[in-house]
Amino acid sequence: MYVPFEDLPEDSKIWIYPSNRKFSDAEITEIENDLKVFTENWSAHGTGLQASYLLRYNRFIILAVNQEVQQATGCSIDSSVAFIQNLEQKFQVDLLDKMDVTFKNGEHIAHKSLIDFKRMAKEKAVTANTIVFNNLVNSIEEFNENWEVPASESWHSRFF
């Protein structure tokens, strides 16, 4: 069952899916509708999950589940991945490529392959102070505190 994101507890589990491109406003409206339907019906072993979503920067899809009410199970996680794969096909984007890095380049959000990001670090086109999106955070609390951080404070630090 859908609940507003801000109503979920801080320890709720999250999954972050960065897009390889910015979504248009029309796409965002459609994605929000799809996410609302998905989270309203998302369940684990027949029990509705208390779930929500966020869209950030017209580029990131964040799914969240209150695991205090009902744990997300393998099958429910599989259904969320299938949902994300459907969005990939529908909008011709990559959302599941974990070998990509998303970071701020001034006011612009850049999305590069890990190889390109390493090269940019070597060439000092990005620095330890570059704001990166740490999409490995696991909870709303971690998301709020450690999602947008300087590269030096994330797994990206190994490149500097």
Where are these predicted regions, by residue range?
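Ordered hydrophobic segments in well-structured contexts
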Residues: 14-18, 60-64, 100-102
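Short, intrinsically disordered low-complexity segments
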Residues: 48-66, 70-71
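Helix-adjacent hinge/juxtasegments
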Residues: 66-95
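Terminal interaction module
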Residues: 96-160
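Long, hydrophobic N-terminal alpha-helical segment
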Residues: 3, 10-56
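Short, flexible active-site-proximal loops enriched in glycine and acidic residues
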Residues: 50-51, 90-100
